[in-house]
């Protein structure tokens, strides 16, 4: 074993020890709040001279706090936002849990992972994070999906929307998103957004283009290593069809690039319809 290997092994051991210490603090049944435990973890990391990791955790804590302020500012203007006579937008509730996980299960890309309890807990927790501004979509009192912003700590907010499979192609996406964007504009003053869409998700592309989104390049999603991306593209060239070619022309890229990337859109929202359907 050379010096580099020894150094790597020591680094891994040190990191594992720090992570275990952090877990011990977070999982301790000592009656302390999550915020108190989080501050204790950051303090301990600083004592261990791991300033970079402490900085990242501190930034996460700040993002959570800022996100909580954004979420409070949004919902204090009204917790029910009417889309039409049957559909409303409201804050996420614990009773949405099963419906939300059903939507994740219907997503073929992560269907196998939804069987894992830890994964389900993780995605549900992310859905409820302070920095995420998620609005549940109800139709006549029944949960049918959600729309919202993934991370309000980012400079450019990314829009998300998912509906239960039985409720797709029912004309709900456009009015729900329009209503949400109107509310965000009137309540928070935010009008610039990003959208990322799978190259083969043609209905979503059509929906956001109808809302005014314009192509803004490509984004990496699962893979980031350039050689791995090229290898993946090479192995899947047979998947390129006429529709992929048309999308590639619209985004002015080689069709093969759509095999390893997602579409990036930019949306500047001027407002349509009612300013805010709050109740």
Protein language model annotation of sequence segments:
Residues 2-13, 17, 39, 43-44, ...:
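Acyl-donor (CoA/ACP) binding surface of acyl/acetyltransferases
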